[in-house]
């Protein structure tokens, strides 16, 4: 009986903490004239976890998002993750428009290429990033067939919200795979093909800047 009461007390405390956190966030956003953020669905997060094997770190986490992602580690509130190194298998889902998402994407790619992280899944609702950041095409990318209904936190839990923008999911597979390892790119394809089209061309993995240099040299006529 005491254990049950203790558990109920913890659940009530956790709910109140979530409500306080959400109210604080709402107040900050209201002061800046912004809306409450939307969060990725558990279905996407679990697919990413299955592909990577774990979610060791979420640099874009906040107290609400951590309820959904349940990453092994999240940054403390005073840490600017754009200036710190990350680790392990990383889930990245930045909030905001193209400018903010491109900052997070560039940071993710930099951490990945320099070996600080093993792999990543990057979820973004700024679909304009497909044009603004050509580096995306160096990696497997899933473009959902339908706009993903994301979640907004309320005092009574999460509510599903129909978005006004398209989404994308980008995958950075482990760079140190051996012949005995599972083909992670195929796993990503199999896990997300029921969500959208997975695109990965034969030149993916090359640095897109090489093609840009080639263009500057040749200036193909159109």
Where are these regions (language model features)?
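Class I S-adenosyl-L-methionine-dependent methyltransferase catalytic core
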Residues: 2-222
